[in-house]
């Protein structure tokens, strides 16, 4: 019934198995990948023909994690998986980026890649396995895909590169880098690092590319026995149209791209485009030689050629800069004084307002992942409204791009944050992109660093980011610092580097062509370092280190530790005690399982009141100390006094006053405030208190000699 094919290799000390022919047989391509005991299913379906009028390639990559893969049931009311999590969105983008450039120009058939995590062994991260499975499924599917692609994770532990480290090993690693590519070229890099130098980062990329070569070989072996017949795809030849268009539009396009201001340049380009359209698609002509879609596509290609030629020939760019110059920068902090921290970062025509907010433990984000529930105390949200590029558009929940850009900035800042012990606050940063002409994610990195320092967060060092581009024709190439939006789209490589003056904290790289050598990548990384250091210098004009104190409107947090066996007493039955403390003091209180208590409030008085209350519950009273208490019950033999928080003790009738007492209620009544001294504990552990040795007016202990004399007299009686 099944015609199965299987390939198995040893990869980084664990077996990798690729299998096809048994599951999802109606898909164009389907591969079940097993690495260790992590199992991932990847499927590919591509429409037989493009939709009429389609002028782009509709590729969709959906990565999904099923909770049954880790033996769990989804939380929430409905108990089934819902919208994609942030991690699922990020992994979908991670897989999309290296495979998209490998589809030929002109292929516009609707294509969907679905990757499902079926089983997770809690040791091997499924994202790289998913990338390998998707590449294999595409290679087998028959669609025009110029793969296969391999992928690997690289760690850096004790000065050594580690291929595909286990999840628990990543805690020791100063690098988390994922690299993907073909046999000949690197296509994609995504990473977070702890201030590593450029040569170490480049070495990790090269190490990873070598590390995934056995995987590519395995996919090729599987394709040799299981691949479907390649689909016939003949891209249209538009060279004649392009040459004709070049002859009438080249000079005007070159002049348009000499205009440095974005809006004016776009207007000039649109005018040339309208002229071209009128020439090749005149009104009233039936059955024209070219469609509007063809003319638009060829004109776009021509734009790219003109810009690339100009840069390579003149070493001058669209806005008049040379290759290494960064656009003018203005950095400001404290622009929203009632927020906890704020910054305005402007670089040329790219601008971000970034706001930092400090919260408490109860503001942490709970993340339910396959590896278990954990809490995240640093959140960075990136918003890209349509007005930032002078357009109208959709508003609503963030898209994949916004989530991806936010995470890139998060990775850049995260290694420089203080530990929870050093700074017990939850941090949320929001970046509002108010203008965009390239590199808004790196503006977010710079703005976030400024806003956090403005908020008083003790960053280890300021962090800056820069977006770089590369244009290559034959043996000529040009590396561009601080690219514009147009240069981003027209280049052969774009990469974003963020870090401190000491090293890189985040690197994201996307390469669209082959032939980008290790030497070229090294030149690009070193040029990026110069740009990053320049930007850090400009940022330092606004603020160079964290403020010594929090903002006026930020909450204060005091941390205290209590014995674990006292947590129940502080919380109380059904949370009764802690609710009372919160209601009466006004402070927010968070208690961790290890006994760490965080008390937060904008008022120091409220924090101190809550701290004293909690201390009175958990601290043990000391023999010989004087405490204030309240009479809660009277009896013939004495009075019960509540003191030191929730503690009760007995003042025997003989200890109520220095003179003889006939009746307890002659001295005290329920509700009376009294001063008591802790005398000790009886043989059953009950508390023994005394009032007569304390001056009830002042709360001070009575002179010892006087007390002893009275004690002796009373005993004689």
Curated annotation (Swiss-Prot):
Predominant location category: cytoplasm
Residues given in the record as Mg(2+) binding sites: 488, 494
Pfam families cross-referenced by the UniProt entry: KH_1 (PF00013), PNPase (PF03726), RNase_PH (PF01138), RNase_PH_C (PF03725), S1 (PF00575)
Enzyme Commission number, as recorded: 2.7.7.8
CDD domains with a match to the protein in the record: KH-I_PNPase, RNase_PH_PNPase_1, RNase_PH_PNPase_2, S1_PNPase
Span of domain S1 motif: 624-692
Biological process annotations from GO: mRNA catabolic process; RNA processing
The UniProt record lists the keyword Transport: no
Any single Gene Ontology cellular-component annotation: cytosol
Top-level taxon of the source organism: Bacteria
Residues annotated as domain KH: 555-614
Location in or out of the cell: Cytoplasm
Cofactor(s) recorded in Swiss-Prot or TrEMBL: Mg(2+)
UniProt GO MF annotations: 3'-5'-RNA exonuclease activity; magnesium ion binding; polyribonucleotide nucleotidyltransferase activity; RNA binding
Disulfide bond positions: none
Keywords for this protein: Cytoplasm, Magnesium, Metal-binding, Nucleotidyltransferase, RNA-binding, Transferase
InterPro entries, alphabetized: ExoRNase_PH_dom1, ExoRNase_PH_dom2, ExoRNase_PH_dom2_sf, KH_dom, KH_dom_type_1, KH_dom_type_1_sf, NA-bd_OB-fold, PNPase
Reported function: Involved in mRNA degradation. Catalyzes the phosphorolysis of single-stranded polyribonucleotides processively in the 3'- to 5'-direction.
Annotated family: Belongs to the polyribonucleotide nucleotidyltransferase family.
Protein name: Polyribonucleotide nucleotidyltransferase
The organism of origin for this protein: Rhizobium meliloti (strain 1021)
Gene behind the chain: pnp
